[in-house]
Amino acid sequence: MAIIKLFSGSHCLKKEVVQNIIETTGYQKITDQNVVQASAKLSNMSETKLFRAFSARASVFNKFTREKETAVAYLKLALSGLLDKSEFIISGYSGLLLSRKISHAIGICLIADLKSRISNAVEQESLSKKEAYKLIRRSDGDCAAWTTLLFDVDDPWNPSLYDMVIPMDKKKPEEAANMIIQNAAKDVVRATSDSNQAVIDFRLAAEVEVALARNGHHCGVDANSGEVTLTINKPVLILNRLKEELKNIAGKVPGVSMVHTIVGKSFHQSSIYRKHDFKLPSKVLLVDDEREFIETLSERLQIRDMAAAVAFDAKSAMDVVAQD
C-alpha cells in the first residue's frame, strides 16, 4: 500500500480518521512532532524555531536570517530519514514536504465547511462560537502560509495539491478512512523502481538544500539519480558568480554527480537575490463563511468508468489579510 500524506483543516476530525486508518491497516504514524524532533538533532535549531516554520508568523529577523527557509531544509532532511518503510501515514504539515515524484505516496486533504468546524471546536474544546471562529481562522492562516511557501499556492485546500479532497461535513471518520485505504491499495500507487529512486532523490535534494542553507543560500533543488538542478528564483547582479558558488557547494555533497543551474519564473522580478535577504511571509488567509467543499479525486486515482470529478472553482472568495 501507498504512503499516506494527510493534511487537514483544524477541527475536521483528523484524529478520528487517522486512528481508524491505523487500526485497520497497522500503519505507523509520523507526526510533525516526530519530524521536528529529528530535525533538531540534525541542526543547531531548537524545536520551537523548527515548529515556527509551520506558522504564518515568522521572526521579524527572518528577512535577514532566513530562519524559516533553513528550518524547512532540515525538516525535509529529517523526513527523508524516516522513510524506511512504505506503510505509514504522515499526519500534519510535514507530509506536504514529500516530493511529488514519489508516486507511491498519496496526498489527502480533510476539510469541512465553517459551520461544522465551529461546531466541532465548540464541542471538543469548550469554546464560544466567536473563540472557535478566531481559532480556525488563525489555523487556516498557518495552512495558507505553508502551502504558499512550498508551492506558491495560497489556497491550502486547492485540489491540485492532493490526490483526494474529502469534505468532512459530509463524511463520517470511518467512511473517510475507508476511502483513503481503498485508494492507497490501488495498483497505480504501488512502489516501483522509479518511485523508490524518487525517495533516494528526495533525500539527496534535502542534503543539498541543507548544505546551501548552511552557506547562506536558498534556491530550488531537484535531484535525479545523482544529477542536481538548482533553480535561482531571484535576480542577482553577477549571475555567473552565483552559479559557480552554488555549484561548488552542491557538488561537494556525497552522491552528487553533476550540478545544473537554471533561473526560475520569478527571476526577472525587481527584487535582488542576496544571502539572507528573503521576502516576508505571505498574508494570512481569511475563512470564507460560505465556502462549500466537494469530494475530489486526482486523475491517476480515477477508475476507468468513472466520470471526471467536478473541479472546484479555483477563484475562491478567500481574502488575504496581514497579521501584524
Task: Describe each PLM feature range.
Residues S103-E123:
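Conserved phosphate-donor/acceptor-positioning beta-strand/loop module used by diverse small-molecule
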